[in-house]
A protein has these predicted regions:
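Alpha-helical assembly-interface signal, strongest on the long, hydrophobic N-terminal helix that forms
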Residues: 1-73
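Short, conserved structural patches
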Residues: 2-3, 51-148
Length: 148
């Protein structure tokens, strides 16, 4: 009796290899999407922090620039508690009063040099986020803050 050889003997383990390749691609793509989502969340949080600091500077014109920086980083003028974002410090925050005390004065709060750190270093370990600046018009009724 003549026995016909099938190709199945030559394909042993191919399913396992295909599964390993597919899982590797899927897991890598999944972590890339998670990291991209975290980067977008940090982008939004930094933008909101700059807005929050500018709003505080306009509404509390008797406050110092350090209080504004604390509001940006900690969400509290006293600077107590944990920073709202990892790696964000008051050194990353700049507060500029332009013609403050006049009717057309402005307050600018900017966050610069923030390093976004990846949880899983697919691309690299850190990237520098762009600067976030918020400028609001202020009327201080003649009061000029101490740290101008």
């Amino acid at each position: 009796m003549l026995r016909i050889k099938t190709c199945k003997d030559n394909e042993r383990g191919s399913t396992l290899v295909e599964f390993a390749i597919g899982v590797t691609v899927f897991v890598t793509a999944m972590f890339a999407v998670l990291e991209f989502g975290r980067a977008l969340w940090v982008h939004n949080a930094l933008s909101d922090a700059a807005r929050r600091g500018a709003r505080y500077a306009v509404l509390h014109s008797s406050g110092s620039a350090q209080e504004v920086k604390n509001v940006v980083v900690y969400g509290d003028p006293a600077g107590s508690g944990q920073p709202m974002l990892n790696n964000l410090s008051t050194a990353n925050v700049n507060v500029v009063y332009n013609n403050f005390g006049l009717n057309d004065g402005t307050v600018s709060v900017s966050i610069t040099g923030y390093q976004f750190q990846f949880v899983i270093p697919i691309v690299g370990t850190t990237i520098t986020m762009p600067s976030y600046t918020t400028t609001l018009g202020a009327e201080s009724a003649g009061f000029i803050p101490a740290n101008v």
